[in-house]
Amino acid sequence: MNNLFFSKILRSDNIHFVGIGGVGMGALAEICIKLGYKISGSDIKENLITKKLSVLGAKIYNQHCANNIIESTIIVVSSAIKEDNLEIIYAKKLNIPVVKRAEFLSELMRFKYGIIVSGTHGKTTTTSIISYIYKEAKLFPTYLYGGRLNNSDDYGNLGNSKYWISEADESDNSFLFFRPIISVVTNIEKDHLESYQGNFKKLKESFIKFLHNIPFYGYSVLCLDDIEIKKIIPLINKKIVTYGFNRNSDFCITKFFQSNKKIIFIVYIKHQKRYLKFVSNLLGKHNALNITAAITIAIKEGIKYNIILNSIKKFPGINRRFDFINKYDLSNLNNKKGTITIVDDYGHHPTELKLTIKSVKKIWNKRRLIMIFQPHKYTRTKYLYNYFVKVLSTVDILLIMEIYSAGENPIYKINSKNLCQSIMALKRSHVIFIPNEKFLFKKLELLLKNNDILLLQGAGTIENIFKKLTSKLLL
């Protein structure tokens, strides 16, 4: 890959990433290191990503400070970073360009064969499956996504071919920077409405614009099961390929079976009049849809069937996407006999919660379900409050942690205590407010008993709870 070519495009050698410890930012920084750029970055917490980047040669700062950017010629910012960040303020004073991650990535992809995945749910899983198939097909893609493959530190890599595969985030409308050859939309729901003046119609209009960003020779891959996608299809004047359980889909899932370890499903390929059977370690109908989106692209792009089939079968999954571990010993926690099953899931939108709860109940029917939930963002909790109440009332015992702010300011009356009270009013679940970690572990000591299912759900610091809990309970 010609580093000089990219230098001419970006006119920059020293790139600084604000919020470099995030998965998406870290993956992009790693790719830039491999392209030959001098990389620095700041994040308030050291993690596995910043450690890896440091080993690769990046200069990492564990605080945000104006001095961090003195040698930088371009500043790349995460969508989680606010305008009042010291480094951003100082960069603007020095007339150093400050660009969003999506804008920067879109420039790298400008002359490449881009495949971009968007949608409210399933972006990371779908993107990682597409990337995995392309790797197995020896197409050597560049790829990056917002998660980490299980049993590895793989969340992005620089390839040496024309293919660039990434997910795109609609949270701040920055997905409109991309001009891919192939675009994917998995679904459209109310989320990130704070970026759209609380107006769902404006969010849908942005998705329509995104789908029109492909060239005349490109195409979009859309899930026909999604109500909102079906509504906007007549408004799209570009080539469309559909997938889903819907019988009118171009790639139609005709049969689906799930055990507690895998899913088996059959896809009918309309233009080939052919049925293909797939087996995956991922669970749930929603994952059958994510997989079928990837299958659609792979078949359309001419990848051999046996490579696709084997890739789907081998795909290890993404960290914290319905990870579960059976037989955790209770004796180390509360001196009780027996074991429990622990499920860890990243989902933080009520639809994601609903799907996870449904999958848990289907796999472990009649077992008591105890759920720890950490709401993510005040704005999401505000706009989807009633939906959260409805979904969260379906578990046996619910423990709700404080809202993870993700940098947002508190909103009056939007808090976990009030959410608990609203759920308790339905009188369906036993609900407990969790003010801190110490209180949580004390409650778990009292509550957990043999054969329970413990579900940890959320995108914030709850991941650390899972690590501490499993270190105590693992047989």
Swiss-Prot record:
InterPro entries: Mur-like_cat_sf, Mur_ligase_C, Mur_ligase_C_dom_sf, Mur_ligase_cen, Mur_ligase_N, MurCDEF_pg_biosynth, UDP-N-AcMur_Ala_ligase_MurC. One of its GO terms (molecular function) is ATP binding. Pathway: Cell wall biogenesis; peptidoglycan biosynthesis. Its EC number is 6.3.2.8. SUPFAM superfamilies: MurCD N-terminal domain, MurD-like peptide ligases, catalytic domain, MurD-like peptide ligases, peptide-binding domain. It is found in: Cytoplasm. Pfam families: Mur_ligase, Mur_ligase_C, Mur_ligase_M. GO terms for biological process: cell division; cell wall organization; peptidoglycan biosynthetic process; regulation of cell shape. GO terms for cellular component: cytoplasm. Keywords: ATP-binding, Cell cycle, Cell division, Cell shape, Cell wall biogenesis/degradation, Cytoplasm, Ligase, Nucleotide-binding, Peptidoglycan synthesis. ATP binds at G119, T120, H121, G122, K123, T124, T125. Its main location: cytoplasm. It catalyses: UDP-N-acetyl-alpha-D-muramate + L-alanine + ATP = UDP-N-acetyl-alpha-D-muramoyl-L-alanine + ADP + phosphate + H(+). Cell wall formation. Belongs to the MurCDEF family. PANTHER family: UDP-N-ACETYLMURAMATE--L-ALANINE LIGASE (PTHR43445:SF3), UDP-N-ACETYLMURAMATE--L-ALANINE LIGASE-RELATED (PTHR43445). This is UDP-N-acetylmuramate--L-alanine ligase. It comes from Wigglesworthia glossinidia brevipalpis. The lineage of its organism: Bacteria, Pseudomonadati, Pseudomonadota, Gammaproteobacteria, Enterobacterales.
